[in-house]
């Protein structure tokens, strides 16, 4: 699959979707995107910068939502213009799809909306690649139905079917907790879509701090290493210069100062995993 001008697949180095959870202004976005670009370039990691203009799924009605649609798209467009990076953001409503798709390079769907047929059809027919997140309630093999739904919608309007990513972001495990099942990453390959592992949301504790979500950011490197060892096409990791001050999802964000070291480790693992191939493909014979 071609994505933003680079090849995606298990025969390629993983690509990275990274940025702050919420867009926190132009200066912050340019700073974070610039540092990520400096970290990824020498390692040969294709980078897609992400940021959310609206955090529609919040634990509390008083939680900060974000800079809004118009301001958010302007900031992302400026990041792309100044740093020559492809950009991604999430959409939460069919009414936003066309406007967002006119600006960004990749759309992303919230995990909770993966079974909403009209929504999936709308993003699939936007003309842009889509990172489709698996719901926390969904079995990994059921993502094939979601991807098939998106492909059918794309076919209806004459668009390529080869523009969808299947993203794992953890599964609910009791109250206020998620776990990441590494076998899901392999199971989701059967969807026929490149698999992305959302590491930072997989360590989230939804609503775990009462009015806000908690997280275990110290487990991000652990799960990231495990996911790369399984073999994935891409990684998704949110980051922040000062996670404790982040507008949202600070408890599970990678401290920006540690991103380069983490990526160096992951590249080494990725090389070993993909060089040696995937023996599991032969175990059914």
Swiss-Prot record:
It is found in: Cytoplasm. Its EC number is 2.5.1.55. It catalyses: D-arabinose 5-phosphate + phosphoenolpyruvate + H2O = 3-deoxy-alpha-D-manno-2-octulosonate-8-phosphate + phosphate. Keywords: Cytoplasm, Lipopolysaccharide biosynthesis, Transferase. It comes from the Bacteria. GO terms for molecular function: 3-deoxy-8-phosphooctulonate synthase activity. Its main location: cytoplasm. Pathway: Carbohydrate biosynthesis; 3-deoxy-D-manno-octulosonate biosynthesis; 3-deoxy-D-manno-octulosonate from D-ribulose 5-phosphate: step 2/3; Bacterial outer membrane biogenesis; lipopolysaccharide biosynthesis. It holds the Pfam family DAHP_synth_1. InterPro entries: Aldolase_TIM, DAHP1/KDSA, KDO8P_synthase. GO terms for biological process: keto-3-deoxy-D-manno-octulosonic acid biosynthetic process. GO terms for cellular component: cytoplasm. NCBIfam families: KDO8P_synth, PRK05198.1. Belongs to the KdsA family. HAMAP family: KDO8P_synth (MF_00056). This is 2-dehydro-3-deoxyphosphooctonate aldolase. It comes from Acidovorax sp. (strain JS42).
